[in-house]
Amino acid sequence: MTNIRKSHPLTKIINNSFIDLPTPSNISAWWNFGSLLGICLILQILTGLFLAMHYTSDTTTAFSSVTHICRDVNYGWIIRYMHANGASMFFICLFLHVGRGLYYGSYMFPETWNIGIILLFTVMATAFMGYVLPWGQMSFWGATVITNLLSAIPYIGTNLVEWIWGGFSVDKATLTRFFAFHFILPFIISALAAVHLLFLHETGSNNPSGIPSNSDKIPFHPYYTIKDILGALLLTLTLMILVLFSPDLLGDPDNYTPANPLNTPPHIKPEWYFLFAYAILRSIPNKLGGVLALISSILILAIIPLLHTSKQRSMMFRPLSQCLFWLLVADLLTLTWIGGQPVEYPYIAIGQLASILYFTILLILMPMTSIIENNLLKW
């Protein structure tokens, strides 16, 4: 009798995806982040579900319902902080996952890469709307500032913003719809993640060398299941240290003040994981220009496969490209720092230089360096 694991329609899918999947024998710890993102997503859906049982999406009670969760609900505080800091872990894993893709040339699988970009946008939208829900000062003003950016769109901008708000300002209608979207989007993300995996399994995984590994594959289980479990344990450890020792480390103190439309906080800034994009937005004095630069900073990932001029897929054996890659990482860290600083000298100038450098590295320096490396190979 055939093993039910390989014959039953449901278990066959699981078997071919997570058990008997032929996997390159040399993939490193950088390949762990896909599974870690899956774990983060499950954690966020579960903690979010329990939070939604006690949360009320009304402007008069939203802030106090979050306080109620932390004070009165059994273990409500840990659920709330696991959800808030789980989002930070999610983005850390996301950035490392995308960075891995850039470094090792995983973008040469166009379908997988493009679905990944859509996933990135969807997760960013979900996180933004989630940040609005506690209805603190930074929630309210963050929502006001970011949604207002759409008014930069010619002709329809103002109408579009008021349509999203459901009125003439961020109010009850806005909060209710943001809660509805924040609830539904993670399930859309789950579906997209399944499609992401589907396309990945059409081609098989890339590996650090960037060389086809069809001649040297090993089963996913037990080799990579045990490796993923180790990654999951380290992720859980990091998250729980954050939650139990310094849960507010990555949050904003202003969000412990209830939303007040009559009082603007001195420095409006988003959560840390959006600061790099926020710095790029602020570095351009023109509103529409800033919005276009903001969108381009993420959408630029979509044209990375077109800019690949190297004869090698991975950066493993390309030292000049490696230097540029780490310069890009340093530049993004600089942008993250600048995004959290007030709009004054010298931060404005540093932000503008870092923004120019970001686009220059990706659009000009990396393709040119690859051509130089190709010529060096001829020597």
Curated annotation (Swiss-Prot):
Transmembrane as UniProt keyword: yes
Which SUPFAM superfamilies does the record associate with it? Answer: a domain/subunit of cytochrome bc1 complex (Ubiquinol-cytochrome c reductase), Transmembrane di-heme cytochromes
As for membrane topology, the entry says: Multi-pass membrane protein
Please list every transmembrane segment annotated in the UniProt record, as residue ranges.
33-53, 77-98, 113-133, 178-198, 226-246, 288-308, 320-340, 347-367
Query: Cellular component GO terms, alphabetically?
Result: mitochondrial inner membrane; respiratory chain complex III
What the entry lists under InterPro entries is as follows: Cyt_b/b6_C, Cyt_b/b6_C_sf, Cyt_b/b6_N, Cytb/b6-like_sf, Cytochrome_b, Cytochrome_b_C_euk/bac, Cytochrome_b_N_euk/bac, Di-haem_cyt_TM
* Cofactors required: heme b
Task: Cite the binding residues for heme b b566.
Answer: H97, H196
Residues noted as binding heme b b562 in the record, renumbered to the chain: H83, H182
| Keywords on record | Electron transport, Heme, Iron, Membrane, Metal-binding, Mitochondrion, Mitochondrion inner membrane, Respiratory chain, Transmembrane, Transmembrane helix, Transport, Ubiquinone
Location(s), subcellular? Mitochondrion inner membrane
Tell me which residues bind a ubiquinone. Answer: H201
Q: How is the cofactor bound?
A: Binds 2 heme b groups non-covalently.
Q: Which GO terms describe its molecular function?
A: metal ion binding; ubiquinol-cytochrome-c reductase activity
Which biological process annotations from GO are given for this protein? mitochondrial electron transport, ubiquinol to cytochrome c
The task this protein performs is described as: Component of the ubiquinol-cytochrome c reductase complex (complex III or cytochrome b-c1 complex) that is part of the mitochondrial respiratory chain. The b-c1 complex mediates electron transfer from ubiquinol to cytochrome c. Contributes to the generation of a proton gradient across the mitochondrial membrane that is then used for ATP synthesis.
Beyond the main fields, what else does the record say?
Heme 1 (or BL or b562) is low-potential and absorbs at about 562 nm, and heme 2 (or BH or b566) is high-potential and absorbs at about 566 nm.
**Family, similarity comment:** Belongs to the cytochrome b family.
Summarize subunit and interaction data from the UniProt record for this chain.
The cytochrome bc1 complex contains 11 subunits: 3 respiratory subunits (MT-CYB, CYC1 and UQCRFS1), 2 core proteins (UQCRC1 and UQCRC2) and 6 low-molecular weight proteins (UQCRH/QCR6, UQCRB/QCR7, UQCRQ/QCR8, UQCR10/QCR9, UQCR11/QCR10 and a cleavage product of UQCRFS1). This cytochrome bc1 complex then forms a dimer.
Q: Give the protein name, as stated in the record.
A: Cytochrome b
Please tell me the species this chain comes from: Arctonyx collaris
